[in-house]
Every structure is written in structure tokens, then in C-alpha cells.
Amino acid sequence: MRSVPKLCSAIVLTWTLAACGSLPSQTFDHSVRAHIKRIQVVPIGTPEHAQARIMNPIGAGFGLVGNFVESQRAAGATQVVEGALADAHYDFRTSLANSIAQAVSKVGFTINRLTGARPDKERSRFLSKYPREKKVDAYLDVYATYVGFEAPQSSTAYRPRLELSARLVSAKDNTILFQDRIVYGCTENTDEEAVLVRADDKLSFRNRAAFQADPTKTARALQSAIDATAWELAKQFM
């Protein structure tokens, strides 16, 4: 396993990789760092909504009826999270883009941010083409497949979870300089090949009602997870 600060639940990652597909990793070759000074961050791909889910819900063991009940429960939890973030006037999409740009700039790159929207069909995959920019050495392409909260089981607390994929592409010849997945929200050890960040035990919510009880806390918890994930991405270039 690659060196990471903390490790994650094998069950969680197995489900995630099965759902999203594994991403071949490519570490950053620091020998090219002398030639990569200016990075343009393209618009970040994000889900339509912040989400909340239970990885192993109790109802899943009761066939189709149980699965239907759990799907309705998950939809309700997601609505609660969305409502809490709206009450806190918090936009996770803007926050994610800002945190990534700020984190990568802290490791020595000059950052430009491409304005405009990411194509809808490429919201959850890497861009098929990049702009031609003479004053840029590489493009940082990031998309998130999950942003929100997750509980391992029905009886356990929710904690923030992020799943994002990142690729650094040479502006000169479109060579892939770096590629990997970053997953925040891990709780136990695993041998899964991904850059994993352990969840902060202090950022927990006993149930979905807790999201609404303190919307500011909900937003701050998600922001903390976003900042930690962005910094872990930036560290890959150090």
C-alpha cells in the first residue's frame, strides 16, 4: 500500500471501487517539477447534491422490500443534509474548488483557474480535452463522485466522506503526469490501493436529525473534510 496518513475500512473501499471502478494510479515524477510551475485548475466535477448514506443498513438484509425502505431512508437523509447546508449558506462546490486551488498553491505552484462550467457529461469523469494555454505548464483535472456524510452501519454515527479522482496533464503534449483517487472518511485499516484519509472522530453526527440541529456544525464538518482532502492531494506533488 502507498504511504498515507491513515487507513480506511476495507468494506467501505470495496463497495466504493465496485461502484465507481478502479482508477489506475500514477505517482508524480518529481524530476519534472522543474518544468511544471504554472498549473491551470479546470472546473471541478461535482455531484448535484451533497449526500448521506449508510454503508451496511439493517434493512438491506430483508430483500427487495428492505432495499426499497433503505433507499427511501437514504433519500430522506440526503435531503436533510442538503437542507442543513442551505440553512448554513454553504456551497460545497465552490468550497471544494477553492480548497483545491489554495492547497496546490501552497506546495509551490502558480495557480490559474479556468472559468466556466464543466460539461455535464464529464461531471463524473476526466475531461476528454483541455484548452490550449501558452502560459500554462499543466492542467489539474479533478472530479468528485461523492461529497457528504456516511455511517458504516445503521447504529453508528455519520461522518464526512469525500471521494475524488485527480489527474495532472502536461499542457505541452497531454502526457499524464499524475493520476489517483483520494478518499476521505476512513475508519479502519485496509490494503486498498488509494490515497486514503482517516475521518476525524470529532466530526460525527449521531443521526440525521443532528444535521438539522446545528447547520453551521454540519457545514464546518464538511469543510474540514474538504480541506483535508485537498491538502492530501497537494501533498502528492511534494
Model-derived segments and spans:
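Bacterial N-terminal signal peptides that target proteins for export
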Residues: M1-I11
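Short, solvent-exposed, polar/charged sequence segments at loop or secondary-structure edges
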Residues: L85-V147, R208
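Surface-exposed short loop/turn segments
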Residues: L23-Q26, D120-T175
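Solvent-exposed loop/turn segments at secondary-structure junctions
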Residues: P47-E48, R118-P119, T145-F149, V183-N189
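Short secondary-structure boundary motifs at beta->alpha junctions and helix caps
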Residues: V80-H89, A171-A230
